[in-house]
Amino acid sequence: MYNDKKRLTMINKRLTASVVASLLCIHLVQAQTLPVYLDESKPMEARIEDALQRMTLEEKVAMTHAQSKFSSPGVERLGIPEVWMTDGPHGIRPEVLWDEWDQAGWTNDSCVAFPALTCLAATWNPDMALLYGKSIGEEARYRKKTVILGPGVNIYRTPLNGRNFEYMGEDPYLASRMVVPYIQGVQQNGVAACVKHYALNNHEVNRHTSNIIVDERALREIYLPAFKAAVQEGKAWTLMASYNLYQKQHVCHNQRLLNDILKGEWGFDGAVVSDWGGVHDTEEAIHNGMDMEFGSWTNGLSAGTSNAYDNYYLAHPYLKLIREGKVGTQELDDKVRRILRLIFRT
């Protein structure tokens, strides 16, 4: 009897050791076969570089422009997900059709309509801004969105601006203090805040063609502080460039605002998104800091084509310039790094 028990104990120990060894082997094999870009335990930048070197030229260019009204492609071959965006600063937009602004008629896309951001700013309560951002971020996550197109922090300069209600007031300091916790609250949910409309978009009349004239002191003391706080303190993951011009160059591909100030001085490492249809020139968009082009079906070079999105300025026209050797891929790789950083953060 004693020998039988001893024999069983020995068998159990051997079986346990065998199972443990097998599990360890499986774990080691999985660790060896899991690509770096899919391994969340690896450093973010290592994952980005690993994904980048696996992507084709066509896959990289595809990531820099929309595939629908509110989405851009990932890389299905590599398991890199799409990016899905939604309005807005004070409530998640009902689902729309793939190519249109019309509602899609879903029955499970109802969300809270929060008070507009001008009301939030009037509380002078950063804790409330944090709760507001956290709450709207939760709803965006429920709806499987990557990016919320907000908050807006353009400064009130005229009562005739039809979008004043969705901004945070006329005081640059107040807007700077309220936008930071809003962003932090949203991004706690793994959803990116997209701060808009950078910059100098302070009225809606002729907004696509207005060249804004402002001196350096006013630019730095009135119009930029809230955006700077959003980037450097709020750590916003995306930012939307505006429709207007500054120094006679569209802001969606403006060397001074996007490259020199935003990405240079402020160290912004996220992705710059165009306002819908705000891109007007392929080469400027390549070189001057635009990362993701969004728009409507007939924007830009797309009128009369079978697939409008392939004819956006950062789509086939961009690919054609690279293939012809007229531009390199350094700027493209920077754009894709920023988009991958957005995807891995969310």
Predicted regions, residues:
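Glycoside hydrolase catalytic-domain context in secreted enzymes
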Residues: A31-T346
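Bacterial Sec-dependent N-terminal signal peptides
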Residues: M1-T33
